[in-house]
Design a protein with these regions (language model features):
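N-terminal low-structure segments adjacent to metalloprotease catalytic domains
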Residues: 2-14, 18-171, 176, 180-189, ...
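Metalloprotease/metallohydrolase-associated module, dominated by Zn2+-dependent proteases
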Residues: 26-31, 36-80, 191-241, 257-318
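Acidic/His-rich structured neighborhood in mature extracellular/periplasmic domains
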Residues: 114-239, 243-244, 254-257, 261-271, ...
Length: 318
């Protein structure tokens, strides 16, 4: 969407200045007074962007247009063309909750055929905060912040878990561009003081194919209880891919850690059919935070409970 804020503001300011001068005959200030005026402070996002950032912005813009032209990035949440049963919901839950998208401790290496792990989620309150790189325009920040806050309310409602927005939280959402990497490192070290250099290197050197990323942290004495997370969303993204990243990474940071090619309708599927959290995905989140499941459960012990939850979510008799 084209935005003309700066051009319109400059035109309006010119009219206001003209009206003031027409109302009273004011002599121009002496040359030395004019020279003493400080240069205007550039607003966020108004500086010159690097060639790399410009190239990424054009690439992701073309990518979004191509996906939409193929009927992908759906925002309808699914419908009659995407039915699923309680058994399918159970299987999708197991694949997405108990397996990892990436091998633990191996950067962005795919997890592959690893065995199932344990159920991980937040046991304590989740307080989400947002940081912007200097390359993000003020108008864009307002839109991103509104989207995040609306989505936080939805996540809290679906999970019935204490999830809220905070100025300083434990789940950090960073909208950062290529030109903000130095700033991003400082923010990461301040907000996640125990973050390793290896993790920082992974976050700051994402390949173009990785649109966004979330990293969740737990303590050694409670490895299945998340206590901090960092989500990074590229500032170069166009509107819908940007919002899609918000939906997927925040939900994954709550414990839906994997993608599955069989999950449909779902954003936890690399086929890009759906852009935003679906009703199917809401059920997964609601099941994940049901008190009948506990952090640290393995897939086998959780399966009987998950089957009951899946039937409940679809309104079926037990």
């Amino acid at each position: 969407m084209a935005r003309w804020t700066k051009r319109y503001f400059g035109w309006a300011l010119g009219l206001a200045a003209f009206a003031m001068l027409a109302a009273c005959d004011v002599a121009p200030p002496p040359p030395d007074a004019q020279a003493a005026r400080p240069a205007p402070v550039p607003q966020p996002g108004e500086g010159t962007r690097s060639l790399r950032s410009e190239q990424l912005s054009r690439y992701y813009g073309r990518l979004q247009a191509d996906l939409l032209a193929q009927g992908l990035l759906r925002t309808d949440g699914g419908g009659p063309d995407t039915p699923y049963s309680a058994e399918v919901l159970t299987q999708n839950f197991e694949q997405i909750v108990f397996f990892d998208e990436y091998a633990q401790g191996a950067g962005l290496s795919a997890a592959g055929g690893r065995s199932a792990g344990k159920l991980r989620r937040w046991n304590g309150p989740v307080r989400m905060d947002v940081s912007f790189g200097n390359s993000v325009q003020l108008s864009r920040r307002e839109e991103d912040l509104a989207s995040v806050r609306n989505y936080i309310r939805r996540l809290a409602r679906v999970t019935r878990h204490p999830i809220s927005y905070a100025n300083e939280g434990n789940f950090h959402i960073l909208f950062m561009g290529e030109d903000d990497k130095g700033e991003m490192v400082k923010i990461l070290r301040r907000k996640a003081p125990n973050i390793s250099q290896r993790t920082i290197d992974v976050i700051t050197t994402l390949p173009r194919s990785i649109h966004c990323l979330v990293v969740a942290f737990s303590s050694n004495d409670s490895p299945h209880n998340y206590t901090r997370a960092v989500a990074v969303i590229r500032a170069e993204h166009p509107d819908l891919i940007r919002l899609s990243c918000v939906h997927e990474e925040l939900a994954q940071g709550l414990g839906l850690a994997n993608d599955s090619p069989d999950a449909r309708p779902s954003i936890f599927n690399d086929d890009d059919e759906f852009a935003l959290l679906t009703s199917h995905d809401e059920k997964l989140l609601s099941m994940l935070y049901d008190p009948r499941l506990k952090s640290g459960m393995d897939a086998e012990s959780a399966r009987p409970v998950v089957r009951i939850l899946a039937r409940e979510k679809l309104g079926q008799s037990l």
